[in-house]
Design a protein with these regions (language model features):
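Conserved alpha/beta-hydrolase catalytic His-Asp/Glu region
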Residues: 183-245
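Conserved HGGG/HGGXW glycine-rich cap/lid loop of the alpha/beta-hydrolase fold
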Residues: 38, 42, 47-96, 316
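Catalytic active-site module of serine/aspartate enzymes centered on a nucleophile-bearing elbow/loop
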Residues: 280-323
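Glycine-rich "HGGG/HGxG" loop immediately N-terminal to the catalytic nucleophile
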Residues: 31, 70, 91-107, 163
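N-terminal cap/lid segment of alpha/beta-hydrolase-fold proteins
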Residues: 19-49
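Conserved serine/cysteine hydrolase catalytic core
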Residues: 33, 217-288
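Flexible "cap/lid" loop of the alpha/beta hydrolase fold
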Residues: 139, 143, 152-183
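Conserved acidic catalytic loop of the alpha/beta-hydrolase fold
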Residues: 108-126
Length: 323
């Protein structure tokens, strides 16, 4: 049914994709890890890209809320060229992985799923690199598995402030779901331009807009919206910043200074809204709280520096990785 729908939509100006991103191709071969979690048989899609000249190190890339393993495309190329093996999963609930209707989402659970994948691949020591929501997951993973993580890299992580404690109104999962059902390419594009790319726009960004919007045009729109709602509830209610002082791994904190991301900002009162997502301040505060942190700032970049200016970002990343 999904394939028939996608075939019918193939000639449209704007693509339609399945609930697991059927019809959208990543730049690298996608593999599947079958797992059982919470009495359900699920699958976790992932990329495992090996270098031609290995340096013996593995980096795990953890994507953000509106990103996928596939959006790490240029980062994977740079890292493998430098000798790193790269493992980039699509977390359960995202992109090409299972989207169960009933699932107790937590960063601990996503970390457990990721650990199971790495065990399956025989990977023991890793650098964990998390972007956006993936940064919150990377922190939780590092706290749960301190002996496995040799370095933590956080790229514009969200959750550097506790929105709920600051007074951002709580939304029910049903309210998040209703909000997500209204998602369009135009709304995605507007948000990404303002937040990810500091007001800039280039044609190459459109691919990632259509990747997301295509799932909302497809036959699994409601599944995708419901999964997104469950995930937003997890992000909003499960802060990790109160445990920053427990992080043992050396940490590279990379912050685009034009970022203004804050979950639930659209529902916040005006006087609070203008204070949220102050990344120049939040990055410095996080660097002070994380014991072995090194802060790298990108003055002109937004929430997605690895996409907005890949040359500048990857130079800083490769320089900051442990030798």
């Amino acid at each position: 049914m999904v394939l028939a729908f996608l075939a019918a939509a193939a000639g449209a100006d704007e693509p339609a994709y399945g609930p697991e991103l059927e019809g959208f191709d990543y730049a690298f071969p996608v593999q599947r890890f079958e797992l059982e979690s919470q009495r359900q048989k699920l699958h976790m899609s992932y990329l495992d890209v090996r270098p031609r000249a290995p340096n013996g190190r593995t980096i795990v890339l953890l994507h953000g809320k509106n990103f996928c393993a596939g959006t790490w495309e240029s980062t994977i190329r740079e890292l493998t060229q430098a000798g790193y093996r790269v493992v980039a999963p699509d977390q359960i609930g995202f992109c090409k992985s299972s989207k169960p209707e009933r699932y107790q989402y937590s960063f601990q659970q996503l970390a457990a799923n990721t650990r199971a994948l790495l065990d399956h691949l025989g990977v023991q020591r890793v650098t964990v690199l998390g972007h956006s929501t993936g940064g919150m997951l990377a922190v939780r993973y590092t706290l749960l598995h301190p002996q496995q993580v040799e370095q933590l890299v956080l790229v514009n992580p969200i959750g550097l402030e506790d929105w709920k404690a600051l007074g951002v109104p709580w939304r029910s999962v049903d309210d998040w779901h209703a909000r997500e059902l209204k998602t369009t390419a135009a709304s995605i594009r507007q948000y990404e331009q303002a937040t990810y790319y500091a007001g800039q726009w280039r044609p190459e960004y459109e691919r990632w807009v259509q990747m997301l919007a295509g799932m909302y045009r497809g036959p699994g729109k409601d599944v995708v919206a419901w999964s997104s709602a469950l995930l937003y509830d997890m992000i909003f209610t499960q802060p990790v910043l109160y445990e920053f002082d427990r992080i043992q791994a050396p940490t590279l904190l990379m912050i685009g200074q034009k970022d203004n991301t804050a979950i639930g900002k659209d529902a916040a009162p005006p006087e609070l809204k203008q204070k949220l997502g102050d990344y120049p301040r939040l990055g410095k505060e996080a660097a002070r709280r994380i014991p072995r942190a090194k802060l790298v700032e990108f003055p002109e970049l937004g929430h997605a520096p690895q996409i907005q200016d890949p040359v500048q970002f990857h130079q800083a990343l490769l320089k900051g990785l442990l030798r």
